[in-house]
A protein has these predicted regions:
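Bacterial Sec-dependent N-terminal signal peptides
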Residues: 1-22
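C-terminal PAP-associated
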Residues: 20-457
Length: 457
C-alpha cells in the first residue's frame, strides 16, 4: 500500500491556558417522546424527493464568506497538482479483503452525511440523509431500511430531517441514533434514540431535545456525538434564523445526557453547557474525542480550531471534568500551540468540469482519546503545492503539560478531503490508527482511500 507523502513532523510543548466562564443549565428532565420499532414500522415504498438539496438559508452569503478566504489563499499558494514536498514512501503489506458489505446507494440527497457504527456482535448500521440501514454480518441478513422522513412522521414532526449520526456503546452494547429536524428556532429539535436491545434494527426510546437550547431564538445545526462511561454527549452549533451556517453562527453548545436513562426509557437527566469561549470569542464546531479501545469517563474532551483561518497554530482543547451533578464538575478551555500552521483547505478539482469538490473548511472532523493520548484530523492546505492534505495531530497529556506533534499528509496525486480517523490498536500502549479520506484531482475522479499510522509514524 502506498503511503501518503509526509510533509512535516514537529513537536510543540507549549500550551497556553485561559480562564473561562462557561455556563451550565440547571438539570433538565426530558420525557420519553415515543418508542419506535424499526422492524414493525419499516418503509415499504421508501418515499423520497429526488434532486433535493437539504436547505441551508442564504447560500449566497455562504459562498461569499468562504470564497473570500479561499481566493486569498489560492493567490498566496497557487495549485501545483501532482507535486509534493516529499517523495518518501513506506512499503506495507498489501491489504486483505475480509468481511465486506455494500455501501449506501446514492439516494439523490445532498449532502449524504454518512455515518456508520459496528457492534461487538457484528451488527452494522449506517445512516445517511435520509435513511437508517442495518445488516447482521453473522447471518448476512439485511433488516431493511427505514427513512428518517417516516420516523419524523411517527414522532408527529414535519419532514425536515437532516444531519443523522449513529453511535455504538460497547460498554452497554447499545446503539444511539441522533438527527435534527427543523430549520428555525420554533421548529428545530434534536432527536435522540436509544436502542432497547443490542441490535440497531429493533425498538428505540426516542427523545426530543429543544433545538433552541438556550431559549434565545436560535436553532441547532451540525451535531457531533460521543458516548462516555456514564453520559452521552452531543455538540451543536447555534444559528440565527434565516442565516447560513457560516455567517449565522452564534456559539457551540454541549448536551450532556445520562445514558442509562435513555436505555431504560426513563425521563432523561440532561444539562446543556454554553458560553464555551476563548479570549471572549466562541469556540466553534466542538468535536468530541471518542474513546479509542473503549469508552472513558466520567470526563469528556472536545477539540476545535479556527476553521476559516488563512493561517494559524491554535488548537482548542475543552475538558468536561465529571458527570452531571458532580461537585467536582468543571469546564476547562485550553489553547494548545500547534507545531505547524494550518490553513483553510482548497476545493478539489475534478476531471472534465469546472465544478470542484467543495471541502468547506478546516474544522476538526474526528478525534479520539486512548489513555493519555489524543489523535485528531482535519483538512488543511499545503502551502508548498496549494493542494489540500490531511492534518494529523497528536497530543500527549501524560506529564500534565500537553505535548503536541503533527503531520500533514498529501495523496500521491491531487488533494484530500473530509478525513476521518479510527483507533486500530490491539495491545496496551498501541497507537495504531487508520485514517480515511476522499481524494481527487483535475486528472483523477474522486474516490476514497486510507492509510495506516503507528507509533513509528
Amino acid at each position: 500500500m502506498k503511503r501518503l507523502s509526509v510533509l512535516v513532523l514537529l513537536l510543540a510543548g507549549v500550551i497556553t491556558s485561559q480562564a473561562q466562564s462557561p455556563v451550565s443549565s440547571p438539570v433538565m428532565h426530558i420525557p420519553l417522546k415515543k418508542v419506535v420499532n424499526l422492524q414493525q414500522e419499516g418503509d415499504t415504498w421508501f418515499p423520497m424527493l429526488k434532486n433535493l438539496h437539504l436547505p441551508k438559508p442564504h447560500p449566497g452569503a455562504d459562498r461569499a464568506l468562504v470564497a473570500s478566504v479561499k481566493a486569498e489563499l489560492d493567490t498566496r499558494y497557487p495549485l501545483k497538482e501532482n507535486q509534493s514536498t516529499s517523495s518518501a514512501k513506506i512499503n506495507a503489506a498489501a491489504p486483505l479483503v475480509m468481511r465486506n458489505f455494500q455501501g449506501n446507494a446514492f439516494n439523490f440527497y445532498l449532502p449524504n452525511d454518512n455515518d456508520l457504527a459496528v457492534s461487538n456482535g457484528n451488527v452494522v448500521s449506517s445512516v445517511s440523509n435520509t435513511m437508517i440501514f442495518s445488516k447482521d454480518l453473522n447471518t448476512n441478513s439485511v433488516y431493511g431500511s427505514y427513512t428518517l422522513h417516516s420516523l419524523c412522521a411517527s414522532l408527529g414532526l414535519a419532514a425536515e430531517e437532516f444531519d443523522p449520526k449513529i453511535t455504538y456503546d460497547p460498554e452497554n452494547d447499545r446503539f444511539i441514533v441522533v438527527f435534527l429536524n427543523g430549520f428555525t428556532d420554533s421548529t428545530n429539535n434534536v432527536l435522540v434514540g436509544f436502542s432497547q436491545t443490542n441490535t440497531s434494527y429493533g425498538a428505540y426510546n426516542f427523545y426530543s431535545l429543544p433545538g433552541d437550547a438556550l431559549n434565545n431564538g436560535l436553532w441547532t445545526d451540525f451535531p457531533m456525538c460521543a458516548v462516555g462511561e456514564h453520559d452521552f454527549f452531543i455538540t451543536g452549533n447555534l444559528l440565527y434564523n434565516d442565516s447560513s451556517w457560516q455567517t449565522g453562527f452564534n456559539q457551540s453548545i454541549i448536551w450532556q445526557i445520562r445514558k442509562d436513562d435513555g436505555y431504560q426509557g426513563n425521563t432523561l437527566t440532561a444539562q446543556v453547557h454554553s458560553n464555551v469561549f476563548y479570549n471572549g470569542s466562541p469556540i466553534r464546531n466542538l468535536c468530541p474525542a471518542k474513546g479509542g479501545s473503549g469508552v472513558y469517563g466520567p470526563d469528556m474532551y472536545f477539540f476545535s480550531n479556527r476553521n476559516f483561518t488563512t493561517g494559524t497554530d491554535s488548537i482548542f482543547l475543552v475538558h468536561l471534568t465529571d458527570t452531571i451533578g458532580s461537585p467536582n464538575f468543571a469546564i476547562n478551555v485550553d489553547a494548545v500551540i500547534a507545531p505547524m500552521y494550518y490553513h483553510m483547505p482548497a476545493d478539489v478539482p475534478q476531471p472534465n468540469t469546472v465544478d470542484k469538490l467543495i471541502v468547506n473548511d478546516a474544522r476538526t472532523m474526528a478525534a479520539f482519546k486512548e489513555g493519555d493520548k489524543f489523535q485528531f484530523v482535519f483538512a488543511s492546505r499545503d502551502t508548498a503545492t496549494g493542494n489540500t492534505g490531511v492534518y494529523h495531530g497528536r497530543i500527549d497529556i501524560s506529564t500534565g503539560t500537553p505535548v503536541m506533534a503533527a503531520n500533514l499528509y498529501l495523496p500521491p496525486t491531487g488533494s484530500a478531503a473530509y478525513p476521518n480517523i479510527s483507533y486500530a490498536g490491539i495491545n496496551p500502549g498501541d497507537e495504531k490508527v487508520v485514517i480515511n479520506y476522499l481524494y481527487g484531482a483535475s486528472t483523477l475522479y474522486p474516490g476514497s482511500a486510507a492509510i495506516a499510522w503507528d507509533n513509528n509514524g
